[in-house]
């Protein structure tokens, strides 16, 4: 048993029926059959667990893209599919925290992945680092906007 993963899975299950602000540590530990001490050993609060889930998802996505060897179009589709599949989680977080904070947090996680894709697509082109950064932000914000709208 991996307690962190079990706690994360419990939170994701609860998010299917409740909003984040209505979910308590008691709900999470009851769902996965551990005690509160176990929760607090790994996380400060429910929001800390949510941040860990987003970090884990972004890292898994980045690893998947790095190892796939696919072209940048497929990589963008992969990111879109992942964001769509986690939409309930993102939207629950969106309703529970400030939109700007959530966007900033998601940009930290997904922004570098998008940047890598943009860099790959720009190989051989005469573009500045500023242009690459602009295009990366444009695509990242567009993808996130599609999730929020």
Language-model-detected regions and their locations in the chain:
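Basic, helix-initiating cap at the start of DNA-binding domains
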Residues: 1-18, 22-23
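Amphipathic alpha-helical packing segments from all-alpha helical-bundle domains
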Residues: 77-78, 99-124, 130-145
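Contiguous segments within soluble domain cores/interaction surfaces
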Residues: 88-95, 99
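Generic hydrophobic, amphipathic alpha-helix propensity
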Residues: 3-11, 28, 53-57
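Append "Primarily bacterial transcriptional regulators
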Residues: 7, 26-31, 39, 83
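A short secondary-structure junction motif
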Residues: 56-61, 86, 90, 113-121
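Amphipathic alpha-helical linker/stalk segments
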Residues: 13-16, 23, 53-78, 90-92
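HTH DNA-binding helix-turn interface
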Residues: 16-20, 33-50
């Amino acid at each position: 048993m991996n307690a962190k993963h079990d706690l994360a899975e419990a939170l994701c299950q609860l998010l299917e029926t409740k909003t984040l602000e209505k979910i308590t540590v008691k709900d999470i530990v009851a769902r996965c059959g551990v005690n509160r001490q176990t929760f607090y050993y790994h996380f400060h609060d429910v929001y800390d667990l949510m941040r860990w889930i987003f970090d884990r998802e972004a890292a898994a996505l980045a690893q998947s893209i790095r190892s796939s060897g696919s072209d940048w179009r497929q990589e963008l589709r992969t990111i879109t599919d992942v964001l769509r599949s986690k939409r309930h989680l993102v939207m629950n977080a969106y309703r529970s925290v400030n939109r700007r904070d959530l966007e900033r947090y998601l940009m930290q996680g997904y922004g570098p992945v998008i940047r890598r894709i943009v860099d790959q697509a720009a190989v051989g082109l005469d573009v500045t680092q500023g242009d690459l950064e602009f295009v990366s932000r444009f695509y990242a914000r567009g993808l996130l906007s599609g999730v929020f709208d």
